[in-house]
Amino acid sequence: MTNIRKSHPLVKIINHSFIDLPTPPNISAWWNFGSLLGVCLILQILTGLFLAMHYTPDTMTAFSSVTHICRDVNYGWIIRYLHANGASMFFICLYMHVGRGMYYGSYTFSETWNIGIVLLFTVMATAFMGYVLPWGQMSFWGATVITNLLSAIPYIGADLVEWIWGGFSVDKATLTRFFAFHFILPFIISALAAVHLLFLHETGSNNPSGMVSDSDKIPFHPYYTIKDILGLLVLILTLMLLVLFSPDLLGDPDNYTPANPLSTPPHIKPEWYFLFAYAILRSIPNKLGGVLALVLSILILAIIPALHTSKQRGLMFRPLSQCLFWFLVADLLTLTWIGGQPVEHPFITIGQLASILYFSILLILMPISGIIENRLLKW
């Protein structure tokens, strides 16, 4: 009799994706982050669902409903902090996943890579809208400042901002629609993730060497399921340490003050995972230029495949490009730090230099190093 996992129409799909999937034998722990992102997404949807049962998307009661969740709902505090810190873990895994794709040349799978970029934008939009929902000071002013950036678009900017706000300022209509979008987008992300996997399984996974491994594959289960469970345990341990010991470590104290349109916080800033892009935005004194730089800081990932000049796929055997890659990582950490600092000397200059370096590495230095390394191969 045929095994049910190979004959049943539904189970067969799961079997081909997670059990009998032919996988390269040498993929490292850097390939764990895909499955961890799936776990983070499921966690966010589940905790978000329970939070939505008690949350009220109204400017008068939103802040007090979050307080009610933490104080009165049974285990509401842990659900709320799992959701808030789960978002941070989500972005850590997301940036690691993108970084691995850049390091090992996974961007040569163009369909998978492009769907991944769409996923990144969607997750960022979802996280931004989620940050607005508690209706604290930073929620309100963050929403005001970031949505107001769209007014830099010529001709339609002002109308577009009012259309998104649903009025002449961030108010009840804005909060209600942000809640609606924040609720529906994770399900769209789930669908996009399924398409992402579909395209990945068309080509098969890349591996650290960057060479084709079609002749030498092993089944995903049990080898990589065990490996993924180890990564999952590390993720759960880190998240629980964060939630149970320092739940507000990555948050902003200003968000414990109810939103007040008449009082501007001394320093408006987004969540830590957007600070690098926020620093790039602030480094350009022109509003439209800043908005373009902000969008390009993420959209630049789409042109990375076109800038690939090396004969080798990944950076495993390319020391010059490896140095540039780690310079880029250090630069992104610097930008994240600068994004959290006030707009004053010397932070302005450091931010501008770090922004120039960010675009220079990706657009100029990496392609040049690829050409140099090709020449070195001939020696």
From Swiss-Prot:
GO annotation, cellular component aspect = mitochondrial inner membrane; respiratory chain complex III
InterPro entries for this protein: Cyt_b/b6_C, Cyt_b/b6_C_sf, Cyt_b/b6_N, Cytb/b6-like_sf, Cytochrome_b, Cytochrome_b_C_euk/bac, Cytochrome_b_N_euk/bac, Di-haem_cyt_TM
**Entry cofactors:** heme b
Q: Per the record's keyword annotation, is Mitochondrion included, yes or no?
A: yes
Q: Which UniProt keywords apply?
A: Electron transport, Heme, Iron, Membrane, Metal-binding, Mitochondrion, Mitochondrion inner membrane, Respiratory chain, Transmembrane, Transmembrane helix, Transport, Ubiquinone
Which Gene3D superfamilies does the UniProt entry name for this protein? Cytochrome Bc1 Complex, Chain C
Residues reported to bind heme b b566: H97, H196
Tell me its family: Belongs to the cytochrome b family.
According to the record's subunit comment, the protein's assembly and interactions are: The cytochrome bc1 complex contains 11 subunits: 3 respiratory subunits (MT-CYB, CYC1 and UQCRFS1), 2 core proteins (UQCRC1 and UQCRC2) and 6 low-molecular weight proteins (UQCRH/QCR6, UQCRB/QCR7, UQCRQ/QCR8, UQCR10/QCR9, UQCR11/QCR10 and a cleavage product of UQCRFS1). This cytochrome bc1 complex then forms a dimer.
Know the name of this protein?
Cytochrome b
